[in-house]
Each structure stands twice: as C-alpha cells, then as structure tokens.
C-alpha cells in the first residue's frame, strides 16, 4: 500500500471517535483516556460509544476523520457506513484479532503512537467487496467464506461463545479458536460447490473457500499473504480435501506463534459467482443466514465483485 497525504499539516483536525467500551482488556484505555490522548495530540474530538442505539447518527456529522476504537466488528460496521463518502478512517486496535489494523501495520505500535501519527495525514486506499445474493446486497471489508471457518463460527455463535468465556486474554482467545479449527478439520466433510471466477469454472469439493479482501481471516489466520486491499482484486483461497494437511500445518504454525505462509491455492480475480443451495456463509464477522428457512433452498446465485478505492484509512509513518 502506497500512502498519500491529505489536507494541510497545520490544521487542527476534527475527530469523531466511535468507541466500543467492551473491547480490550484491563490495560486498554477508557473512553475518557482516548479522548485525552486525542486532545493532547492537538485535535478536537467528539466521543460516541458504539453501545448507544443511535451511534450511527454521529457519522452524519461533519468531521475530518472518523476514529474507531475496538475490534474488527466495529471497524467493519463504521467502514461500511462510510463507503463512497471519502471520510478517512483511523483504526485504534483494541479487539481480539484486529485483522484490519494488522493489515494497515498498526498492531506493532502503541495506541499513543498511532494517535500521534495522525498528524502526518498519511492515507491508503482500501477496497470493499460487494456480495449480492438471497440476502440482497452486502459489502464486506475483510472477506466472505464458507466451509470449515464459517461452520465453526456458526457453532461458536450458537453456543454464545461459551467455549471462550473463561478466557480474558485476546491472545488466548485467538489460540483457542485456532485449536478448535484444527480439531474440527480432522473430521470435516467438504462442501460440493459450483463456482466460476472471472468466467472460469472452478467447481469442486472444498473444505474451505474464503474470498478475501485482506490477508487475514478470523483468529489472525493468514491465508492470503499476498492480498492487497487496494489493488481492485479479491484473493480467493481454495482448500480441497487433498489440501487438508496443508491447512492443518498452517493452523499448527499459527497456534505455535509462527508466521504462517501457507502453500494453499490462492487465485486473484474480480468477480466470483457461487451457486448457493443452503450452506452457511460468513460475511465479515456475521454468519448468514440466521434463519435458513427464510430463503428457498433452490439454487440461488451469490455474485461477488470489488468496489475499488471506496474507502481510505490512516496509517502511521
């Protein structure tokens, strides 16, 4: 990603801060502390908790930057609301995985360092995916997928994440989900999928299919190391039954804290079409459908394309 500068350095910036107060741990700054850090960096700030029912209305107010403090869930919600509005987004990573912030190179910096870096006004362009199907149309920031990861998300959500409730540390939660994925992989039955990518038929039996806008999915799992969120292309990860061992090794490396560079099949493209016949799909961190009976199980087409440079994110120097 090649950063570019916006605005003039000497101007005081007006920051709208959207904060998820449930994100982070005991060491994470509170809302008041975040406001103080932003003030001390020389900016004006308007605070909004994402727990307020009408928090989205704050995004209609004029500002120079929308800062988002929390995890990928709230970052994605804000980003989808700002598509095509050309308002820069500043991510403050305080979640479990922080995949978007990791993509932007922010997870190796402290929160005060990230906020201090805003004065440089460095932006990068960021694509969004668009998935049209039985749910109408939805944009995604991280990715869309089906198979092992999606089914595991669905099971965890159905149990209200009780398998992770005893864990307070974000890193422990990430490792626990990776271990659950690795265990489920041993007995997972591949899905038969009818797929075309830019007109090429790639139908087959797949353990996992992930349509990725960034390199990471879920628990910091790097499946598409060469994904670039501003190149106008999607990275589609195909894991067939024959590649089960490769995915298992990737999960094992991630559990051990190694920088996984999986030798999985990844294809780049602009348009993917999948015939949906009732299997579970995830769109970013949401599992669809909530109620399978809401849609007919006769085949429906999922059409996935790219909206190029529809968002801008701040990065640190």
Stretches with model-predicted labels:
Residues 2-69, 76, 80, 112-119:
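ATP/NTP phosphate-donor binding region
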Residues 197-198, 203, 222-223, 228-317:
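ATP/nucleoside-binding phosphotransfer catalytic cores, i.e., glycine-rich phosphate-binding loops
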Residues 20-22, 50, 94, 239-241, ...:
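Cofactor-binding loop segments of dinucleotide-utilizing enzymes, especially the Rossmann-like FAD-
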Residues 29-31, 78-82, 102-104, 154, ...:
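Short amphipathic alpha-helical segments
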